[in-house]
Amino acid sequence: RSLKEVKDQSRIFGQVFLTYIEENAQILWEDVSESASDAVAGLLKQSQAKQGEQTESVSLDQIPEYSDSPYVEINGNVPSFSDEKSAGPAYEFYSELDSLGRCGYAESKITPELMPDEERGAIGMVKPTGWHTVKYENVDGRYLYNRCHLIGYQLTGENANKKNLITGTRYLNVTGMLPFENEVADYVHSTGNPCMYRVTPFFKGDELVARGVEMEAESVKDQKISFHVFVYNIQPGIEIDYTTGNSWEE
């Protein structure tokens, strides 16, 4: 099958079934017949598990202040994916934007078939909440902000998907998130095994720029990949107004 066909199917599982079933999980689970497909039955259970996982997520108040490291381990560095999700089909899911236009969590069961085989296209047309085009001499590459993929392009081939892009500092994108993305990508490429992956942006109140992102991953077959971290959306030497995205040198 082509990459487009695989992604279309994964989106059906992730964006149609999971969204619809999340709203009707209990009723559907009680009424589902023995003749229901294993995939649909599994998704029903996945949705129920997902609801529990999301409500148990760490809160921003529990995250320590930034202190020289781009990330901090949370929940004992243990991810919280359900067995039902891990055993289910490949999928990708991107939350709807909230009333302020902000991204919610993005999640996928990453497989080699979902990973792109072509270079990333243009994404400059997407303006995530809090976006400003601003340069500083003391920032690598000079641009303070990047359009940060929640699920990196190399993992699911999502390009200019506004549900998957947030305003993130160069430090968040390259120093913080990229090493974890590369770890997952290298594992899936080298083994062919699937890996669960979820990234959740953390916004404080009505702020338009996320304070950071929660990243979780777990390889399904051997647990060689397993992490649960919070990556800070900061830039050393730069102060950020997270309400507006405005910034200035310290």
Task: Enumerate the language-model features and the residues they cover.
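Domain-level detector of nuclease and nuclease-like folds
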Residues: 81-250
